[in-house]
């Protein structure tokens, strides 16, 4: 079902509630990465161009007690957003009550207001996280229409997304629209061949994604720590490599079901220690020494995966190929990132998290069609699950 987008709404003279994802990393009260704020600008600027009043809100971190509030205020975000927009952003240091209501009433067309961290409502009974109906209704009463642009929390049913949408006409912002188009497109209607590359440490984190993508993709390439559970399932020696022993039978079943659709590494970069200072070397995937552990894919696997990618029309990548944070074991992730970035005739998508960070670190971000802003949300979307934050947006 097609969802309404912000361009479907009449915004002139309207109080537009906008759920943004301003959950940015902070250190000593300063924002260390403003990507999420920048990502929300197109939606905010469109609302202002249409002479709407933009009332923004977001969560920031987890807040369970009064002490947790320390360093979790959105005030620094308001200051940064003001710089990026080149206009004042009124900050209201509360989540409800007369001060907020008065500030909204006094807001003029084309003005912006940001109110305090929605998770401050979690201190007394988790009202935000448990989607308290009264809170959703109250927030909805502050506006005329609702725009949800926070894909990063779309897999959660909270008062600030589902709660408001249950009470008010709602639409997707431009960022949410893009996520639905690209991440949803992989699941619903990909251009073929579709190749999925999945990495990361644990099979358990990606089981649902692997199972779903095996029914959708033409090839699923597996790297990262979870490969060793698959190798063990094939009876290969994996030495001291990461193993989820309770998932070996499951991996066996997936291998049987997948046939040659699932492609595993043919070599591994191994070391005796989980350290950047220890000696390391490359061995065949079926002969990892008993006293060593695999920490990356080797060059032969990079070449194999690069070959499997040729001719792909859609590529989705989620999860690093090795211990990316240690430079000796980052080559696999870099190699795969380069191989995808060099594809000229494919829609290329990164499903958030560490892979997105890797692409940005390597300066390849602009070579990808889409880099998702939501780690958990994009994983659940790729699993084929319905996301409450998306489902609750009004249908066209």
Swiss-Prot record:
InterPro entries: Phosphoglycerate_kinase (IPR001576), Phosphoglycerate_kinase_CS (IPR015911), Phosphoglycerate_kinase_N (IPR015824), Phosphoglycerate_kinase_sf (IPR036043)
Keywords: ATP-binding, Cytoplasm, Glycolysis, Kinase, Nucleotide-binding, Transferase
HAMAP family named among the record's database cross-references: Phosphoglyc_kinase (MF_00145)
Residues bound to substrate: 21-23, 36, 59-62, 119, 156
Annotated family: Belongs to the phosphoglycerate kinase family.
Subcellular location: Cytoplasm
Subunit record text: Monomer.
EC number: 2.7.2.3
Name this polypeptide is given: Phosphoglycerate kinase
Catalytic activity, reaction form: (2R)-3-phosphoglycerate + ATP = (2R)-3-phospho-glyceroyl phosphate + ADP
Xref: Gene3D superfamilies: Phosphoglycerate kinase, N-terminal domain
GO cellular component, one term: cytosol
